[in-house]
Amino acid sequence: MSLNIFWFLPTHGDGKYLGTSEGARAVDHGYLQQIAQAADRLGFGGVLIPTGRSCEDSWLVAASLIPVTQRLKFLVALRPGIISPTVAARQAATLDRLSNGRALFNLVTGGDPDELAGDGLHLNHQERYEASVEFTRIWRKVLEGENVDYDGKHIQVKGAKLLYPPIQQPRPSLYFGGSSEAAQDLAAEQVELYLTWGEPPAAVAEKIAQVREKAAAQGREVRFGIRLHVIVRETNEEAWAAAERLISHLDDDTISRAQASLARFDSVGQQRMAALHGGNRDNLEVSPNLWAGVGLVRGGAGTALVGDGPTVAARVKEYADLGIDTFIFSGYPHLEESYRVAELLFPHLDVQRPEQPKTGGYVSPFGEMVANDILPKSVSQS
């Protein structure tokens, strides 16, 4: 099975270490452009753009990077309760047209009650999912060209319609991640691709089976994806050393404050991430080559695959064997790590790469010439 591999745009900050300003770098438009263009050239299928008050706006970032990329797709956030479904449908169609069919959408219900209240959304967990189902039903139908009247508990529209359709027909794909039963019910009914954070394979298999069963009961099939960090090096020893360096500036106070902040979230997925490490930096390898160190201070995706290329590829294939075809990766710093993943991991996987334009570039693709006129030795790809 060919795998879709996406990268990540760190619109909330980037650096060499977690929990410190040492090694941090400015994430301005020029830097985001560097990462997007690297991902585009290296063969990543798309980039996930995060959402929330700690991030730049995902839609504006995506729109700004369309002209400087050629094949890269942009996975941007739909926020039920923050924007109306009909306006979101118009925006989605516009972004798809402007990008010539390179727009994808990630439904985000939110998990931080404090942030949601600041955005004017005062629904509890169950109510947010009720509203998200209503939002998605309307958004899908409008984007597919239907005239929509809808009288729901949370949302009511009359005569909603879209005058200018998207490039992708019947509409761009909808992604979504959530671990609660309400989230799985929504995924089974509404989305094309269900995402999970990087839990151990047995836990991921259980979630996939649950969503697959719920979707089948509605006569639907759902694809599956996973969100993970990657720390890949030429040797396993180098990779584990890099993992330790990433958290080498974390002290107990920083970890404690981060975990206390994340504890207020009502996201089941966030609770499952936190349970993997329990706020303790000992025994962070929670499954072979699956390391929970990132989650000590980072909300959301908190685990990384660690190892050399063949080792990480073997773990990726374990997830693929469960039915996962889409992997959304990231690494610190995101520019350098995009190259490491492409150069050290891609050769060991069947990666579904976007078609590359044929160019007559001046620089040869085989490396630097030896002694001015000798071609470097070629290396077989396994």
From Swiss-Prot:
The keyword Cell cycle does not apply. Its EC number is 1.14.14.5. The keyword Metal-binding does not apply. Keywords: Flavoprotein, FMN, Monooxygenase, Oxidoreductase. GO terms for biological process: alkanesulfonate catabolic process. GO terms for molecular function: alkanesulfonate monooxygenase activity. It is an enzyme of class 1 (oxidoreductase). It catalyses: an alkanesulfonate + FMNH2 + O2 = an aldehyde + FMN + sulfite + H2O + 2 H(+). PANTHER family: ALKANESULFONATE MONOOXYGENASE (PTHR42847), ALKANESULFONATE MONOOXYGENASE-RELATED (PTHR42847:SF4). Catalyzes the desulfonation of aliphatic sulfonates. Belongs to the SsuD family. This is Alkanesulfonate monooxygenase.
